[in-house]
A protein has these predicted regions:
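Glycine/threonine-rich flexible loop motifs
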Residues: 111-120
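Short, glycine-/small-residue-rich phosphate/pyrophosphate-handling segment
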Residues: 137-162
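Short beta-strand segments
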Residues: 18, 44-46, 81, 105-108, ...
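Short, Asp-centered acidic motifs that coordinate Mg2+ and/or phosphate
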Residues: 102
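Alpha-helix C-terminal capping segments
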Residues: 91-97, 126-135
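Electrostatically charged, flexible surface regions
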Residues: 153-271
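A cross-family phosphate/adenosyl-ligand binding-site feature
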Residues: 15, 26-99
Length: 271
């Protein structure tokens, strides 16, 4: 068992937990549970599914915030009838009164890799949090069957603990993807660059005469030949893929020191 995350220097920290799948999704409660020991945790998330909304904000629209029943003792929960970005803004400004230290978003059902991450409301929430000066990290995984996996929870705790470190600058931005978990478990954690790929946008005609738009990742080469060190290639090897990005221009940061601390902490948990 991995113990001893919280220290007296960070116990007072406020942690905002959000997602793009709605406040009732199991993934957000697995995430809240994983970080609950690290500080004062509050869930602020959309009322319903907001997948694919990216950094979208509800301008010129009244957005309601309602406190709802929490699924965890000691954790308050608020439902927002808006986007994940709205949830971060209203959570930090209205609920926390500009006193949020860290924002964690997820756990998203499905990878957020390559260019797909910029469509994701899960990662979009983290981008907005970073832009507002908060440290932020998005978490995603392929199959939600393992959302409550003990190792997954401890890796999230370890990464978030480093996110909260005074050594991690304000506005830092990270994206974390968990691999498909095999019988042998997770093979480790590694830094990764967003893979080079194209987006494949599909449009289906619906019975009511309207159209449904959905996306899928179109990888330019097959999984065995992916560029070494890309997020998709790291995941294909059964490892957790951690990506650091510059919150001001979203450039990939290969040598980010906080990223390397997170990788080391995750690998200590995984063993």
């Amino acid at each position: 068992m991995f113990l001893g995350w919280a220290t007296s220097s960070i116990l007072h920290m406020n942690i905002l937990v959000t997602n793009d799948d709605g406040f009732d999704n199991p993934g957000i409660w697995a995430l809240a549970k994983a970080v609950r020991s690290l500080g004062e945790v509050t869930v602020v998330a959309p009322v319903d599914n907001q997948s694919g909304t990216g950094c979208s904000i509800s301008f010129r629209k009244s957005v309601n915030v309602d406190q709802v029943t929490s699924k965890l003792d000691g954790v308050n929960c608020f439902a927002v009838n808006g986007t994940p970005a709205d949830s971060v803004i209203l959570g930090s400004k209205y609920i926390f009164k500009d006193d949020v230290d860290v924002v964690v978003s997820g756990i998203n059902p499905g990878f957020n890799t390559s260019r797909n991450m910029f469509i994701s409301g899960t990662f979009g929430a983290a981008i907005i949090a970073s832009a507002l000066g908060m440290r932020a990290c998005a978490f995603s995984m392929d199959a939600m069957d393992h959302v409550n996996d003990f190792t997954v929870a401890n890796v999230i705790t370890a990464i978030t603990n480093e996110l909260m470190s005074p050594e991690t600058p304000s506005g830092s931005l990270f994206n974390v993807n968990f691999p498909t978990i095999s019988v042998s478990g997770i093979n480790g954690a590694e830094g990764s660059a967003p893979a080079r790929s194209d987006l494949k946008m599909n449009v289906d005609l619906q019975s009511d005469g309207g159209y449904e738009i959905f996306s899928g990742l179109k990888v330019n080469i097959d999984g065995l030949e992916l560029t070494s060190g890309s997020d998709i290639e790291v995941l294909a090897r059964g490892k957790v893929a951690l990506t650091a990005l510059d919150g001001t221009n979203l450039n990939y940061l290969r040598d980010d020191q906080s990223l390397h601390r997170m990788i080391d902490a995750a690998n200590r948990v995984i063993g």
